Amino acid sequence: MPIGVPKVPFRSPGEGDTSWVDIYNRLYRERLFFLGQEVDTDISNQLISLMIYLSIEKDTKDLYLFINSPGGWVISGMAIYDTMQFVRPDVQTICMGLAASIASFILVGGAITKRIAFPHARVMIHQPASSFYEAQTGEFILEAEELLKLRETITRVYVQRTGKPIWVVSEDMERDVFMSATEAQAHGIVDLVAVQ
């Protein structure tokens, strides 16, 4: 039996009455965000708007992005990554569960020294893929060229943010590479593994 989204009490500063808000809105007010689904334009736009709004509201207090995602759309994930680099507050990324595919790209985009993985978290990197198989030859070639550009961009970001040589990152992206939290730390995707 689904319980829906829990409601929690919240009192705005300066207000006497407590109101009940859903737990996500309460956590947003504490600058905590959750990427707990496949990355698509809806969740991307929601996270981007929250980061921008809260960075305008207070640009010196860190934002926290908790990640448990199988990945998803590359362009939507890159939009989240770019916003994380654009906003003034540091964005701390915390992997709990799984950060796979474009979600691992978002994870590595957190502020250097502020990227964390829970002890039993898993991280997976690979090259971008497409499901555009039924296209005409010309469209297929254009799609392949775009995928190659995306792969080069993603590889360059991983190299820059992990400190690993380009040949290591390129080789790892050839297939699905799953890592434990400590392996992700050794790979430079996260800086710390949370203690139990």
Swiss-Prot record:
Q: PANTHER family, per this entry? A: ATP-DEPENDENT CLP PROTEASE PROTEOLYTIC SUBUNIT, CHLOROPLASTIC ATP-DEPENDENT CLP PROTEASE PROTEOLYTIC SUBUNIT 1
Q: What is its main location?
A: plastid
Q: What is the protein's known function?
A: Cleaves peptides in various proteins in a process that requires ATP hydrolysis. Has a chymotrypsin-like activity. Plays a major role in the degradation of misfolded proteins.
Q: What class of enzyme is it?
A: hydrolase
- Protease as UniProt keyword: yes
State any single GO MF term: ATPase binding
Q: Which domain of life does the UniProt lineage start with?
A: Eukaryota
Protein name, per record: ATP-dependent Clp protease proteolytic subunit
The UniProt catalytic activity note for this protein reads: Hydrolysis of proteins to small peptides in the presence of ATP and magnesium. alpha-casein is the usual test substrate. In the absence of ATP, only oligopeptides shorter than five residues are hydrolyzed (such as succinyl-Leu-Tyr-|-NHMec, and Leu-Tyr-Leu-|-Tyr-Trp, in which cleavage of the -Tyr-|-Leu- and -Tyr-|-Trp bonds also occurs)
Question: Where does it reside?
Answer: Plastid, Chloroplast stroma
Subunit structure as annotated in this protein's UniProt entry: Component of the chloroplastic Clp protease core complex.
The GO biological-process annotations, alphabetized, read as: protein quality control for misfolded or incompletely synthesized proteins
Q: Which organism is it from?
A: Aethionema grandiflorum
Q: What is its EC number?
A: 3.4.21.92
Q: Name one GO cellular component term.
A: endopeptidase Clp complex
Keywords, ordered alphabetically: Chloroplast, Hydrolase, Plastid, Protease, Serine protease
Similarity annotation: Belongs to the peptidase S14 family.
